[in-house]
Amino acid sequence: MPLFAIGERRVQLVGQNHFIAHDATLVGDIILHNDANIWFQVVIRAENDRITIGEGCNIQDGSVLHVDPGYPMTLAMNVSVGHKVMLHGCTIGEGSLIGINSVIMNGARIGKGTLIGANTLIAEGKEIPDGVLVLGSPGKVVRELKPEERAGLLRVATGYVERSKFYKKNLKPLT
């Protein structure tokens, strides 16, 4: 498994049913909760502070999560982090989705059930409310999400949990 301690900082797997792709790299003070799934070529580095990844979260292919001293990272339950996302010392609320190729900087806080659209930049220290759509660089609130859109964000997370179980059972290297 691609898990590494650095000094006294080590990865902790809480609960069960984790999926960590063979080429992902997790280093340092990381807490990974039940049903969290970490996909191919993800790098999670926590040598400076703690990264907590909540139950049912998915970190999709090519994403990077890193923290600076004094800027821990927390992803609440059922957060979806899209492909090639860069998260740095931020907090993401329950059931939110961070779109492909987005960047969220130190001290930023994303509310619950919020959609950060693809290619969006959330600046350092920015606070985004619950249940909104954010687009652009810098990211701006465009509108509130409809209840069915927020439910769709949760379906993404639960779908990735199911997909991760399929991969755990069926993924085999070719020789």
Model-derived features: where do they sit?
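C-terminal segments of enzyme domains that contribute to small-molecule binding surfaces
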Residues: 2-13, 73, 77-81, 85-86, ...
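Left-handed beta-helix
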Residues: 16, 21-22, 27-28, 33-34, ...
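A short, polar/charged loop-to-alpha-helix boundary motif
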Residues: 51
